[in-house]
């Protein structure tokens, strides 16, 4: 949604390449600590006020100080306007992902900005402006007459927030032009619409708590089963992900044994062959997990059994958990799938695996978040000093390109790491999903970039390019 209303210093084009947006150019100092962006002249916010370097500096310092969203700008020491069209960022330390992150933060006006009310009345410089927003119901937008880029041919666009079943029913009744559907509905027939299946970097997988139960600040953490590397490895190499995709996702998606694929910073050595059932059984047996009379493994009185969480508002994740549970049975591991709302599920993640969705064009977003010992989404509580060292080295590189080979070491450096079948395996990655939409036959949604994770919004990244055929 942010993309609809706001502009960025830089942006991703339809080929996922970083290109100018608000900024016409930028330069980086030799020591990698100063970034200077020169803005295009004459850009205005949707209310007609000029967008200046002061607004850019304000936007970055606000997110740095408030920690809003999931973009990490803690490395910024200062941001200031040198003049109306030049903004300078001083960093405390080098950050190779800084340029990429400047393609992720929308610019807001310094004057009159109020964080509490802003989502109900956003003032941006992007291709659209808000007409009406009813949380959980609908969002109505119209073209921003001040926008400096390609103008939409549509006078007004309405986004409806619907359940999967309701969305499909509305599509079948001819009330929608575009509707995202879960794979379980993708083989339905909808008159006047066609299925569009779009490739992504959007991966699904489960964190596996890496240590035995203990209390931290009075709260329970850890899991007695997934704490055993033998269980984590047996699950990773033993299950058949292709069968899970076929049975749980209608065959739509690509099996994934690692977090990253087909990206310049993805390490091919992190991937491995799965479906090695007998080898996985032997790993469990050798580790002391013996089958009981019910066909479930036990070790020192502990059943090889645990819950696995999906999300009640995203049944795709629950369906994946069901598929994993069916595969785990063959290993003598009892997994019980559960579905909760997101907030409740997050209260359970210190002890219980949850299905995560992720995929980012910023390498640090996923690799620091999931694998860094202080990562914001490292619910596996994975900690490896060598991995942390590689992360620091990658961030300290002068450019993203220089960092790519180091990011590969974060995943697996040949001796240690979270990924590869010989790694620590704090996650059980399952699939890189496809995003599936029914689209009206007379609507052209333009060239789509390979979608990142985004809960249905990535299809609208090029909304101003959509047109009737």
Residue ranges of model-derived segments:
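N-terminal lobe/hinge region of extracytoplasmic solute-binding protein
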Residues: 1-30, 61, 123
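Gly/Pro-rich hinge or "lid" segments in bacterial periplasmic/extracellular proteins
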Residues: 13, 101-152, 156, 166, ...
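Aromatic- and charge-enriched surface segment that lines or borders ligand/interaction sites
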Residues: 24-67, 82, 88, 170, ...
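Surface-exposed binding/hinge segments that line
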Residues: 27, 31-38, 71-112
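Detector for C-terminal structural segments
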Residues: 134, 143, 204, 236-268, ...
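Ligand-site clamp/hinge motif
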Residues: 144-189, 325, 334-336
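Ligand/substrate-recognition segments at binding pockets and active sites
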Residues: 289-359, 435
């Amino acid at each position: 949604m942010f993309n609809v209303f706001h502009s960025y210093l830089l942006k991703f084009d339809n080929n996922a390449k970083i290109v100018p947006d608000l900024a016409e150019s930028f330069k980086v100092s030799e020591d990698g600590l100063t970034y200077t962006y020169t803005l295009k002249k004459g850009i205005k916010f949707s209310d007609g006020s000029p967008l200046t370097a002061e607004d850019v500096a304000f936007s970055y310092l606000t997110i740095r100080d408030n920690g809003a969203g999931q973009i990490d700008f803690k490395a910024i020491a200062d941001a200031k306007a040198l003049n109306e069209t030049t903004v300078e960022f001083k960093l405390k330390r080098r950050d190779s992902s800084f340029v990429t992150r400047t393609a992720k933060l929308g610019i807001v006006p310094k004057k009159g900005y109020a964080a509490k009310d802003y989502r109900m009345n956003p003032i941006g410089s992007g291709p659209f402006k808000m007409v009406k927003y009813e949380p959980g119901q609908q969002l109505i937008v119209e073209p921003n007459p001040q926008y400096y880029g390609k103008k939409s041919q549509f006078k007004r666009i309405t986004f409806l927030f619907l359940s999967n079943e309701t969305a499909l029913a509305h599509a079948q009744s001819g009330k929608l032009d575009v509707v995202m559907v879960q794979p379980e509905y993708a083989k339905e027939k909808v008159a006047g619409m066609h299925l569009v299946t779009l490739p992504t970097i959007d991966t699904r997988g489960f964190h596996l708590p890496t240590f035995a139960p203990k209390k931290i600040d009075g709260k329970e953490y850890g899991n007695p089963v997934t704490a055993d590397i033998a269980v984590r490895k047996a699950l990773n190499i033993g299950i058949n992900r292709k069968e899970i995709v076929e049975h749980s996702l209608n065959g739509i998606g690509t099996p994934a044994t690692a977090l990253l694929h087909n990206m310049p910073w993805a390490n091919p050595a992190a991937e491995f062959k799965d479906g090695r059932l007998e080898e996985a059984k032997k790993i469990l047996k050798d580790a002391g997990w013996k089958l009981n009379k019910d066909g479930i493994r036990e070790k020192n009185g502990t059943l090889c059994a645990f819950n696995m969480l999906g999300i009640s508002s995203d049944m795709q994740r629950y369906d994946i958990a069901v598929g994993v549970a069916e595969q785990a049975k063959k290993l003598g591991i009892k997994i019980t799938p559960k579905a909760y709302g997101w907030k409740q599920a997050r209260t359970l993640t210190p002890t219980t695996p949850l299905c995560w969705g992720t995929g980012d064009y910023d390498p640090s977003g996923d690799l620091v978040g999931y694998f860094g010992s202080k990562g914001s989404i490292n619910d596996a509580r994975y900690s490896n000093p060598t991995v942390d060292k590689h992360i620091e080295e990658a961030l300290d590189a002068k450019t993203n390109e220089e960092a790519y080979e180091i990011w590969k070491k974060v995943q697996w450096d040949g001796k240690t790491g979270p990924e590869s079948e010989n790694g620590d395996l704090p996650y059980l990655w399952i699939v890189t999903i496809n995003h599936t939409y029914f689209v009206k036959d007379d609507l052209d949604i333009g060239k789509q970039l390979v979608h990142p994770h985004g809960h249905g919004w990535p299809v609208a990244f090029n909304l101003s390019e959509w047109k009737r055929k």
